[in-house]
Structure formats: C-alpha cells, structure tokens
C-alpha cells in the first residue's frame, strides 16, 4: 500500500506529493472510504476533503482530488450527497483544483452521473472515471467526451446483465 498511499495524515501526504512533484509527477489525492451510511461520517469525510483542498492550495502542490459519492452520503440521500459534493467542488473551483469522480459498483453508476450532470451546470472543474467493462461504457464516453475522463478496467465484480465478465 505504501506505493499508492501518500500518507495517513495531511502533513505526510503533502511531503509525499512534494517529492513526486519534484520528479514532474502530478498526484491524485483520494480520502479513502466508501459506502458510508451515517450522516455524521459523511460530513466528516467532506470536512477532511475540504482540509485536503486547503492544504493543496496552501502548499502549492500539483495535485487534484478524487472522490467517491458513497463516501459523501449517496446511500443516505441524493440531495444530502449533492450538497456535500457541491461544497467540495466549489472550494476546489475557487483554487482551480480539479475534482474527479471515482465510479463505484453498478448500483451507484447512474446516480453518480446524475451528480456530475447537476454539478456541471455550475462548475467546470470536474471529471469522471468510466469503467470500460460496463456495456454502457461507449455511450458514457461519448456523453462525457468533453470532460476529463479516466478510463479504467473496473474493480468491482458486476453481474453479467450490466458488464462483460472477461476483463
């Protein structure tokens, strides 16, 4: 995990990112966690991400944010999650920091795209992951082709009804 985890706190993360930046490497910062079912936990996750955004700005490091909607309350309530993510995206926009949406399992796919669609009405600093093994991936790439996209294989075991089984 040490090769992909920059640290367990913000000072460790800043130091790791600075070292990578010295080698011309830009970084993605992901506050690990997903599938949150408690409002307070989702709010804590939001506050942690806002602190990371402040640290990126304060230390002038080359990094952007990656987030998972379920960590910010998607399984609790769509509007609650939207408000949490909007606060993050707005703060990041203020500092010209990009925010990438990680995609989760198929049951969260469309609600995550709905969040992106709604946020993109006011913000241009968002992008998304497209999981290539979903049957709908080509359509999603076409729809979001003007966004910053990261195409990935996909890490979740998905049913045959929605995804290719041989990766």
What are these regions (language model features)?
Residues 1-167:
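Positively charged, amphipathic and often flexible ligand-engagement surfaces
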